[in-house]
Every structure is written in structure tokens, then in C-alpha cells.
């Protein structure tokens, strides 16, 4: 079998993998990125396709341009189940043609020295002496099996986790996903019968009957094209997502022309805190495989780019020291936790709270402003839910009709603060991971009890 050597092997060329490749390019490293899809389908993952502009600015990633940019977004409108209350949260973003943008980032990385193979599958890890040292690949273009050795493997295989799942199960990096900590999602892109009103605002509809544990979305891709879909919580025994889509599409997108269907597809999405560790001996895990998706709104492209940025940062540091052990790559965890993971863990608490609410609770809470737009904005941006003394008093008055909701909100705020502080005090070395993880699990267990 043919053997090749690289400094870095990136498995998966979606938003996470392509970002890591882009950030690592022109740094003097020999890098190979492989993806199992043909080039023109890399990055083609069914989702809402919306990304905050702030992510591009912070990470130095190129803005989408031309056909990659389908719509500029100025905010989100959030609808209560009874449609009587609408909150508006302002913020700039892009509605993307995600595959086109993804492929351009890959092409730029390629132009800067990264080698890219499409139609190539990582068959199994090379695992020796407790380290991931590469992978056995099968290239369907050349119809050959190859052994590729590398100092670091970046696992960016998405929800399938198809590479790290083949590692010895005792490694912390192989952590599995509870079905209830994931959403099943489905979406279609259709043309509309007439121009969309306020086409620069995304619409999100919360309803525990039409999308239990998730939400419906209506994301304009211009004046007469829309990405419409829904997510529902996994592991709950709910009916097929296609049943919900067919039954309720007219309620949320009455303006679409069903004969003008452009794209359709479904996906599974992790909606929890990130992996307890995203780095181990010779390996870093990013993107959906590292559970980097926002637990509340299910968006994963921005946080995937953050994880790619952190992977590049940790890898460059490891090459400076020559240490590719878990300790040498530990900066991956520190970087991601500080950039996004602490907030994400806090939002995992908020997600659990929202999924337990009834439609009546949500209608009442939004109408009476027991939960406010400012709460949502602060939670989404920082992972915080701060309630001042005066604010608490006003909420008590508003919440007299539903004291249990107010009590739960207090428990939510406290648990969000606890878990965020734990993540901001993430262990500085692998030796402390086990005790820290037990503390996190205790917070989650206690919070789940408070919701019962």
C-alpha cells in the first residue's frame, strides 16, 4: 500500500474543515484535506444557511460575494406559538449559498498550498502507542488505498463522527451523543408567488405542537426565494419530520410556490455543549463532530468556523513546541471554550428549559415579558441571563399567573451562570479533565431535576 506523509491531515471539507485549512495555509506546513463528496457538493449540508457577519469579522474569514451571497440579513423576528407576540432581534448577517462559499474558501486554501482530494474516504485511523498518527484513505478518483501519516489529524466529518468513532472507546475524544441532545432537521428552498415582505429579516416560529423541541424557520434568500424548514428534538419518538413539514408548511410559508422547488434535504444536528475535550494525542475534533452547534437556534456554520480557527491556532502552537500529545494540543480546548464553548454550554441549559415549556407557557412568557427580547439577545450573544432586583420584582408581578414559570426561570439563570463559570475555568491540562467533567455533569443533573 502506498504511504504518504503530511504535517496535517484534515478529514472533511465543510465549514469547519475548510476554515481550518484556510487558517493553516501559508504557514509552512504540508497539509492534505480530504472529503468523501465530489468537489461540487462539498459543503452541501441541509440547514438554514444563515451566518452572523460578526463571525467573519472576528475570524478574518472572507465575506461571501457574488452568487455566494443570496441575501443580507438585518435581524430575526421570533413568533410566539399563537402568533400574537412577535419579538425583533436586530443583527447583521448573511444568507449564503453555502456550497459555493465553502468551495471558494477551499479553493483559496488550495491556492495557498493546501492539497485537496475530493471523493476520498478515511477508512480507519492509524492508532499507535496511544496516538492518532494518520489514516488509511480510499481515493475513488484513482481507485487506490493509501496510508497517510501525519503529526495531527483534524476530524471534521460532521454529525456522522465517522473517523473518531473508530478509535478505542476508552479515549475521551470518542464521546457519543445522546439522541435527545440532537435535532432532526428538514428544509426546502422554494420560489414564492410574490415578493417577500421584510425579506431582510429571518423568521423563527416556536410551537411545541408543530415542531416539538425545535422550531420552524422562514429564511428569505432574496425577494422571491426562501429557505423554509423545521427542526424537532431527537430521541423522543415523535412522528416523521416529513409529516410535520407536509402538515404545517402552509401555516408558516403560505406564499411559496410548491411547484418551484429548488432544493430539499434533511440532516441531524447536535444541540448541546461541545465535546468535553476536542483534542487528544495526535487529533483535534471540530465542527458538528465536536458538537459545536448552537444549542438554542441550531446554527452551526459560525461556530464551525470558530472551531477551525482554534484548531489552526493549537496546531501552529504544537509545531512550535514539537508536542502533539493531548497536552500539546490542549490550546484547542482553551481557545474554543473562551471564544464560544462557555456560551454554548450555558445555552445548553437554556435549550433544556425551552424544550420543557408548553405553548401556553411560551405564549404567556412572551406576552407578559417574563422572558424579554433583551434576555434572548444577551443569552444568544454571551450565554448570560442576568436578572436585576427591580427586574425580578416586575417579573414577579407579570408572572403571578404562572409562578412555576418564574421559578424555573430563576433556576435557569442560576444554572446558566454555574455551567458558564465551570467552562471559563476549563482545566489547563488533560489530567484534570475527569474531575471537571464530573462537576459539569452534576450541574446538568441538578438542573434537569429542577425542571421535573
UniProtKB/Swiss-Prot annotation:
What is the official name of this protein in its record? Digeranylgeranylglycerophospholipid reductase
Identify the NCBIfam families for this entry.
DGGGPL_reductase (NF041080), GG-red-SF (TIGR02032)
Protein residues bound to a 2,3-bis-O-phytanyl-sn-glycerol 1-phospholipid: 55, 297, 340
What does the UniProt record report as the effect of altering residue 47 to S in this chain? Answer: Seems to be able to reduce only one double bond of GGGP
Which catalysed reactions does the entry list for this protein?
a 2,3-bis-O-phytanyl-sn-glycerol 1-phospholipid + 8 A = a 2,3-bis-O-(geranylgeranyl)-sn-glycerol 1-phospholipid + 8 AH2; 2,3-bis-O-(phytanyl)-sn-glycerol 1-phosphate + 8 A = 2,3-bis-O-(geranylgeranyl)-sn-glycerol 1-phosphate + 8 AH2; sn-3-O-phytanylglycerol 1-phosphate + 4 A = sn-3-O-(geranylgeranyl)glycerol 1-phosphate + 4 AH2; phytyl diphosphate + 3 A = (2E,6E,10E)-geranylgeranyl diphosphate + 3 AH2
Instruction: Tell me its cofactors.
Output: FAD
Q: What does this chain do? A: Is involved in the reduction of 2,3-digeranylgeranylglycerophospholipids (unsaturated archaeols) into 2,3-diphytanylglycerophospholipids (saturated archaeols) in the biosynthesis of archaeal membrane lipids. Catalyzes the formation of archaetidic acid (2,3-di-O-phytanyl-sn-glyceryl phosphate) from 2,3-di-O-geranylgeranylglyceryl phosphate (DGGGP) via the hydrogenation of each double bond of the isoprenoid chains. Is not active with NADPH or NADH as an electron donor; the physiological reducing agent is unknown.
- Please give the superkingdom of this protein's source: Archaea
Q: Which GO BP annotation is one of this protein's?
A: phospholipid biosynthetic process
All disulfide bonds of the chain are 310-335
Q: Which organism is it from?
A: Sulfolobus acidocaldarius (strain ATCC 33909 / DSM 639 / JCM 8929 / NBRC 15157 / NCIMB 11770)
